Every structure is written in structure tokens, then in C-alpha cells.
């Protein structure tokens, strides 16, 4: 591929989607490196910061579920442009906030940057053929996810760190308020600019026929049937304990390293936190690749679920993630921040592998309806990012290390449900059988053409 190819067709749209997702994640977690300054500004406790971390995610689950069909109907350039401009405006508003209520409210709206994942997934799928779709989605998701680590945790504190002088905020606010306000303001401006660029230069699909098929391929009855199948439900709750955990850790680790280990240097604490984000983001495509590999080579990784090769890999990654939560508590109790950083990196590794594995299974289980399932999995999975920070920071905990064990214990029912669905006799009907919606009544809907 030549450099000029990036200016045309599918590569231009992949580049736009990836840039959108990366900036979206940077904005989504831009508050995390500055929790110390924000806490001082508004007089917040550690428990209050946990609530702020949850508030930054609370609008995303419903937003992801809603934006999926809207993107199918109106096209990614329209929904991406509208989302980025809205996010940018409220990020700028949060930069000028002088009360806790205004700050929290504006960050909730700015958190809609997290729905850019669903927009990008749909847009990339509209342009790439099936044989290249896994690689394209892997690039999009991996580089985009890294926005939380490389963008929010690594880059922003180095640009807008201690001692930063800004021509706008330096005169309007105290010097201690400059860095985080400037970070929110300038990332908001970038979002507005990218939103306009996306709308002008993005194309919704590779052909008009593809565009019309996507618009016509979704109905309310079809959506209800698909999202209540065993496979869709188990992948959704599994995404809570993987991607939801990633969101929670991205928003919490900076505070954890500072409060639990007395690491007050914003750049060092953010760098430690970034190791998790980089592992969880950049290594994600490897999880999908391994799922493809064990499937093609018919490798039985576990003595259970014989012949269910993708299921075995996904289940192994989920068990690993659960165990690493207990490992985080053990590492923290040593009192050694470097051991805790390594433990968090291992958690990030598990998140990367499991997320890649889960989204390798979405089209495998639902080849005709992967877009609809991706929307519900992505939306439900975000719930973990709302709930887990509260468990990490609850005021009744004896210390900040025990919260990880509580979260790990909460994952056990999800792992048990996954084991049940992944049994060969259940797995083979996981896209036909389900809960709530009558199987026989809706059986005809399953075969209707979907997004892909």
C-alpha cells in the first residue's frame, strides 16, 4: 500500500475511524491523570473521585446501544460528526467549570466520546471485505483503545503538566487549575475540528448498494430476537468483566497509585497507569488472531468444550482476567508500587486477549447480524466501567487494595454462565435459542440480512 492510498477509499475511512476512536478515548479518560488537581479544586474525597470516574462512563452504555441503529440509518460520517462536535463542546464547557455540579454534568456529556467505538466498528465493516475485516477492525480497535494510555495517561500530562502556562487559563484561573483545564479545552477543540473533517471527507459505505442494504437490514423485531440469544447475552456480560474492567482501570489507576502508594508526581503516576492502557489497547488484535488460529488449526486448549475452539480460548481468557483481580490485591498488599504496576500490566494483557477473543466470536456466532450484536455487546460491556470504580474506592473498604478482590468475586457468576453456554450442545444453538423472545415465533427473523 502506498502512502497516497490513505487518501482514498477504504483506507481513508479506516484512518478517519481510527483517529476518531483514538481521540474519543483520549477525551473520555482525559480527567484521569488530573484527579489530584481536580480533587483539590472541588474539595473531593477518594470516594467522590470514584463517583466521578463512574459518571464519566454512565451515559455510554445506552449511548452505544442507540448510536448503532442511528449509524446504520444515517451513515457514520453523520453520526461521527455530530458526536465529535457535541463531545468537543461539552469538553470545553468542563474546562471552564467552577462548580462540582457543572463539572460532573459536562463530563457526563463529554463521555459520549466512548460511543465512537460503535460508530467506527460499523464504518469499517461497511468498507472492508470479510477476509480483511478482522485485521481492519483490529487496527481500528487496538490503536483506538490506546488513546486511553498513550493519549490520556502518557501524552496529556507531558503537554499539560505541572508548570504549564496557558494564555487563556493563566489569566482567568489560579495557576493550580491551568493544566487540566487546558487539556480539556484543547482536546475539545480538536474533537470539533475532527468532527467537521469526518463529515466532509468520510464516506458511509464502499457502494450505494451496500449502504442501502445496511439501512434496510435492521428492524425492531430482528433486534429483539438477536440480542436475547444465549450467545449475545453471554458475550455481553463477558464484555462487562473485560472491556468494562478496562474502562474502570483506565479511570482509576492514576488515583490508585497516588493514594495507595503516595506517588504524588502526576507524570510518574500517569506513566504507571499508562502501562495498563497500552497493554489493553495495543495487544487487543492478538486476542482475535489467536482465536482465528486455534479455530483454523482445530486446537483443543482445554479438556472441556471439545471441538469448540474459539469458546475454549475465550473461556481461558475470562478465567485469567478473574484471577488477575485477586492478584492485584495481593500485589498491592506488598506495598511495592512496581509489583502493583506489573500486576496491572498483566490485567491489561488479559483484557486485551479477552476483548479480541470476544469480538472474534461476534461474527462467528452471528455471521449475518454481527453489527447488531456488536452494538449490544459494546453497550452492555460498558456497565463494568460504571460499577467497578465504585467497588475500587468504596469508603467502607479497609484499604484501596481489597476492592480488586471484590470485583474478582463478582466475576465468578459470569464465568459460570459462560461455561454453561460454551458447552457444545448449548453453543451449537447459541444464535437460535435464548430468553424472553419466543424462539419459534421469531425464527424467521434470524436469517434476515444484517449489517454485513
Language-model features and meaning:
Residues 29, 56-65, 115, 149, ...:
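Residue-level signature of mid-helix packing/kink "hotspots" within the transmembrane helices
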Residues 169, 199-221, 427-440:
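Flexible cytoplasmic inter-helical loops of multi-pass small-molecule transporters
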Residues 31-35, 228-288, 355, 359:
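Extracytoplasmic gate region of multi-pass secondary transporters
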Residues 140-204, 401:
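Helix-loop-helix hairpin linking two adjacent transmembrane segments in secondary transporters
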Residues 85-98, 319-334:
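C-terminal ends and interior cores of transmembrane alpha-helices
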Residues 43, 75, 96-101, 113, ...:
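Helix-breaking motifs and short loop linkers at transmembrane-helix boundaries and internal kinks
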Residues 106-144:
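Cytoplasmic helix-loop-helix junction between adjacent transmembrane helices
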Residues 62-101:
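Conserved MFS/SLC helix-loop-helix module at the cytosolic interface between two early adjacent transmembrane helices
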Amino acid at each position: 500500500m502506498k502512502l497516497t492510498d490513505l487518501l482514498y477509499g477504504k483506507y481513508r475511512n479506516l484512518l478517519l475511524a481510527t483517529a476518531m476512536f483514538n481521540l474519543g478515548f483520549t477525551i473520555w479518560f482525559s480527567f484521569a491523570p488530573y484527579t489530584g488537581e481536580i480533587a483539590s479544586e472541588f474539595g473531593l474525597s477518594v470516594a467522590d473521585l470514584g463517583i466521578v470516574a463512574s459518571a464519566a462512563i454512565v451515559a455510554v452504555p445506552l449511548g452505544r446501544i442507540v448510536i448503532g441503529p442511528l449509524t446504520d440509518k444515517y451513515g457514520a460520517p453523520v453520526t461521527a460528526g455530530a458526536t465529535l462536535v457535541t463531545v468537543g463542546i461539552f469538553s470545553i464547557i468542563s474546562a471552564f467549570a467552577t462548580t462540582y455540579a457543572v463539572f460532573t454534568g459536562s463530563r457526563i456529556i463529554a463521555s459520549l466520546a466512548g460511543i465512537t467505538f460503535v460508530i467506527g466498528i460499523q464504518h469499517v465493516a461497511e468498507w472492508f471485505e470479510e477476509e480483511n475485516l478482522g485485521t481492519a477492525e483490529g487496527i481500528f480497535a487496538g490503536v483506538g483503545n490506546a488513546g486511553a494510555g498513550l493519549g490520556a495517561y502518557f501524552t496529556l500530562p507531558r503537554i499539560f503538566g505541572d508548570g504549564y502556562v496557558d494564555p487563556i487559563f493563566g489569566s482567568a484561573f489560579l495557576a493550580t487549575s491551568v493544566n487540566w483545564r487546558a487539556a480539556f479545552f484543547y482536546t475539545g477543540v480538536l474533537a470539533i475540528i475532527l468532527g467537521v473533517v469526518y463529515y466532509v471527507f468520510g464516506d458511509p459505505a464502499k457502494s450505494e448498494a451496500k449502504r442501502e442494504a445496511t439501512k434496510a437490514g435492521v428492524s425492531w423485531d430482528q433486534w429483539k430476537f438477536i440480542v436475547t440469544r444465549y450467545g449475545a447475552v453471554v458475550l455481553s456480560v463477558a464484555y462487562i468483566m473485560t472491556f468494562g474492567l478496562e474502562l474502570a482501570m483506565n479511570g482509576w489507576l492514576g488515583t490508585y497509585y497516588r493514594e495507595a502508594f503516595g506517588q504524588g508526581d502526576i507524570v510518574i503516576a500517569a506513566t504507571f497507569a499508562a502501562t495498563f492502557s497500552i497493554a489493553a489497547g495495543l495487544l487487543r488484535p492478538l486476542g482475535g488472531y489467536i482465536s482465528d488460529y486455534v479455530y483454523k488449526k482445530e486446537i483443543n486448549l482445554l479438556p472441556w468444550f471439545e471441538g469448540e475452539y474459539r469458546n475454549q480460548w475465550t473461556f481461558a481468557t475470562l478465567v485469567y482476567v478473574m484471577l488477575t483481580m485477586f492478584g492485584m490485591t495481593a500485589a498491592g498488599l506488598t506495598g511495592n508500587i512496581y509489583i502493583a504496576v506489573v500486576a496491572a500490566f498483566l490485567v491489561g494483557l488479559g483484557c486485551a486477549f479477552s476483548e479480541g477473543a470476544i469480538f472474534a466470536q461476534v461474527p462467528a456466532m452471528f455471521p449475518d447480524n454481527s453489527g447488531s450484536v456488536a452494538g449490544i455487546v459494546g453497550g452492555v460491556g460498558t456497565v463494568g466501567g460504571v460499577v467497578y470504580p465504585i467497588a475500587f474506592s468504596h469508603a467502607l473498604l479497609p484499604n484501596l487494595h481489597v476492592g480488586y478482590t471484590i470485583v474478582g468475586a463478582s466475576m465468578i457468576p459470569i464465568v459460570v454462565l459462560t461455561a454453561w453456554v460454551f458447552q457444545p450442545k448449548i453453543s451449537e444453538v447459541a444464535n437460535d435459542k435464548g430468553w424472553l423472545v419466543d424462539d419459534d415465533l421469531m425464527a424467521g427473523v434470524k436469517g434476515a440480512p444484517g449489517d454485513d
